[in-house]
């Protein structure tokens, strides 16, 4: 790490911008999901015709939106934490909790998901897995690939936040939340 935290800041800023860009693109999935749900409901109740592929598409779109929303939430600090306790702690204690939370919980969990997710995707690809439902969606490996990819992005976002938190502890000592907000890219 550099003595002034500049290298960490550049890396963190790059990852933040990437996460915000991907999160912005993926956010349109919610509009598409809404359209698919409305179409499926109209087909089912107005025309008595259920479409398996639309139902499966709903599940897949929701999964993609949720999975890629994790890194966006971490980048924008909009994830859930125990604020009742968190707000009572000193900025330095919050920074240490953030640092150890990322190191001991978030990064190992991301590593496990990627480690076990990649063979899951490869197996699906190798056998040409398709939906078991008649009329279901093909290329099941594609939706399964969103799991390790999204968790790789989440891990990169966590590392960026970890570096920023570490830099705050070493050089400036504000809370990581304050430092995070002051270094956030101005446009998504």
Predicted regions and their residues:
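Alpha-helical transmembrane segments and membrane-interface helix-loop junctions
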Residues: 1-173, 177
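Positively charged, low-complexity/disordered segments
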Residues: 175-178, 182-188
């Amino acid at each position: 790490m550099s003595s002034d935290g500049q290298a960490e800041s550049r890396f963190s800023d790059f990852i933040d911008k990437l996460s915000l860009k991907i999160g912005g693109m993926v956010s349109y999935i919610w509009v598409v999901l809404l359209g698919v749900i409305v179409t499926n409901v109209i087909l089912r109740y107005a025309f008595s015709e259920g479409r398996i592929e639309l139902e499966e598409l709903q599940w897949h779109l929701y999964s993609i939106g949720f999975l890629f929303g994790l890194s966006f939430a971490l980048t924008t600090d909009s994830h859930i934490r125990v604020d009742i306790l968190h707000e009572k702690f000193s900025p330095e204690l919050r920074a240490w909790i953030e640092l150890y939370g990322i190191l001991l919980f978030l990064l190992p969990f991301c590593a496990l998901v990627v480690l076990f997710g990649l063979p899951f995707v490869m197996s699906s690809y190798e056998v040409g897995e398709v939906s078991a439902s008649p009329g279901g969606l093909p290329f099941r490996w594609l939706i399964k690939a969103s799991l390790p990819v999204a968790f790789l992005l989440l891990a990169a976002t966590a590392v960026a936040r970890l570096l920023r938190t570490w830099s705050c502890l070493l050089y400036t000592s504000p809370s990581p939340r304050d430092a995070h907000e002051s270094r956030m890219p101005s446009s998504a």
